[in-house]
A protein has these predicted regions:
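N-terminal localization/anchoring segments of enzymes in phospholipid and broader phosphate metabolism
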Residues: 1-250, 257-259, 267-268
């Protein structure tokens, strides 16, 4: 009871969406239009940009989903040097360009694999339709590991560069859904980091075959086996830094916090 407190005002801020729907343009702020990421304003191949500039952090909805993530997949589907595309699909929009680009890629001779989560809440029927369309296009569709829900949002592109094969990746916190990308606050990363590419290769092998990876992940922390122990270890590390008088900081961005062990660790750290 000592940890329960009252606040003045609303708790369910989502109810304010009803006010936004009122037809009073004179009371509305100007519409927000996502900006192109400054590093992606270059019209060269997005793969050249990622290779030369390095990892690109995306912040949606402030930065455009269309000119970053959708562009990444669009160019991958038509680039003659791209050999393969692998992707997880949890939720997408009815008028999804993502699906179109995957179909285009298959028709252009790329090897395309999509892991579709059929138990995505409220979108089960839609995902079955998407899976059928992808399979009809000749795309290899799998449905994840039995007993687990595939909630990760990742794309892996294998491209033949001037010096050999290179893996390009997108890792995001939000769905590949153009509509919610204009509303929800999410982060994404475009990168060709070799370690991340190798980790994603292992992850897709696991998601498509069920075989446990033969090596440890170097940079990714996939749930359910790796993420929680790693977070607890990192929280403890920062606690030890603080005790020793060294700089220490913990910053989390999350949709919700429900795990009791993580919560307890954060209390101890604070």
């Amino acid at each position: 009871a000592s940890e329960v407190f009252e606040v003045d005002g609303m708790m369910a801020l989502r109810d304010l969406f009803q006010i936004v729907g009122i037809n009073r343009p004179d009371l509305h702020d100007p519409s927000h239009h996502p900006l192109d990421h400054p590093k992606l304003s270059d019209k060269r191949s997005i793969f050249h940009i990622i290779r030369e500039i390095g990892p690109i952090l995306l912040q949606h909805p402030y930065e455009s989903f269309a000119t970053s993530v959708e562009r990444f997949l669009l160019e991958a589907s038509f680039d003659p040097k791209v050999l393969a595309i692998k992707m997880t699909l949890y939720r997408t929009s009815e008028d999804s360009k993502i699906i179109d680009y995957l179909v285009d890629a298959a028709q252009n001779g790329k090897q395309v694999t999509v892991v579709v989560e059929l138990k995505a809440r409220f979108d089960e029927a839609a995902n079955i339709r998407w899976a059928n369309r992808l399979e009809e296009a000749g795309i290899h569709v799998t449905y994840g590991v039995l007993g687990l829900k595939t909630h990760s949002k990742v794309i892996l592109v294998v491209r033949r560069d001037y010096n050999g094969l290179r893996r390009y990746a997108h890792i995001g916190t939000g769905n590949y859904h153009a509509g919610t990308a204009r509303l929800y606050s999410d982060l994404g990363l475009l990168t060709c980091d070799p370690a991340i590419g190798e980790d994603l290769t292992e992850l897709f092998n696991y998601l498509t075959t069920g075989y446990v990876p033969k090596r440890l992940y170097r940079k990714l922390l996939p749930a359910p086996k790796v993420l929680k122990p790693a977070l607890l270890a990192k929280i403890e590390r920062e606690s030890e830094h603080a005790k020793a008088g060294r700089p220490a900081r913990i910053q989390f961005k999350m949709n919700a916090l429900e795990d009791k062990d993580i919560t307890a660790a954060l209390y101890r750290a604070s």
